[in-house]
Regions:
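Hydrophobic alpha-helical transmembrane bundles of multi-pass membrane proteins
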Residues: 1-219, 227-233, 237-247
Length: 248
């Protein structure tokens, strides 16, 4: 398992998405009418409870607060409520977001167990929570507000048809395209490149850690310890390099 290189930036990105989602859901209404306050409240509540329940899942599974679950939780709540944000009560939004957070956290654990890479947690957040959000329309939506004259069971069947048809089109269409591309240009890097990091292996962009590793490797091969490790008081690797130079 590779740890994220910058958790604070990832968390900031999630907060920016959260803020932007108010405009996304509110703007999708198409008019500045009485639905807007309900949409904004439901969006906020679902994201908040997605954060709470996903974080709780991280604590239960890993026995400690896990940043990944805290970052994906509110996003899962946002995805879950998007389809029904204008047609459910705030109490329903809490339930939808809570279940979305649990589904997202469970999917993260499942993907790690079956060893499927998903570096941006798109499957837990957008696929799993998106499916749940689509189903939630039939379970919690106010059909009178929606103008739907179906039973909940009938609407649930319609939602499932939509999930299956759109999901099949996207999966098989993407699979065929990527399979063809992969035949000419392999999409996955090798194990060494993956461990080294794509910034270095593909873009030749060095990092403090990589520079420190290069010095240590060179010293081990040449047994010449006159080469100094990079020093920087503002990075972990630079601080280690400073102390290493003192030691040597």
């Amino acid at each position: 398992t590779f740890q994220g290189s910058n958790t604070p930036i990832a968390a900031l990105g999630a907060l920016i998405l959260w803020f932007g989602w108010f405009g996304f859901n509110g703007g999708a209404n198409g008019a500045m009418d009485i639905k807007i306050p309900l949409i904004l409240i439901n969006t906020f509540l679902s994201a908040s409870f997605g954060l709470i329940f996903s974080s709780m899942m991280g604590i239960l599974v890993l026995k400690k607060p896990e940043p990944l679950f805290m970052i994906t939780g509110p996003l899962a709540g946002l995805v879950s409520i998007t389809a029904s944000c204008a047609y459910v009560d705030p109490s329903d939004a809490i339930v939808i977001g809570s279940i979305g957070g649990i589904i997202s956290g469970s999917t993260i654990v499942l993907l790690e167990k079956i060893k499927i890479d998903d570096v941006v947690s798109a499957i837990p957040v957008h696929l799993a929570s998106g499916i749940w959000g689509t189903i939630a329309v039939a379970l919690f939506g106010n059909f009178e507000m929606m103008g739907v004259e179906k039973t909940r069971l009938e609407q649930l069947f319609i939602q499932l048809i939509g999930i299956g048809s759109i999901g099949s089109f996207c999966f098989f269409g993407s699979y065929i395209i990527f399979k063809i591309i992969n035949s000419f240009f392999p999409l996955r890097v090798g194990k060494i490149e993956e461990e080294l990091g794509l910034n270095i292996s593909e873009h030749n962009a060095s990092t403090d850690t990589h520079e420190l590793l290069e010095v240590l490797t060179k010293q081990a091969k040449s047994e010449d310890y006159s080469n100094r490790a990079p020093q920087d008081p503002f990075t972990d690797s630079g601080i280690i390099g400073t102390q290493y130079n003192v030691l040597m």
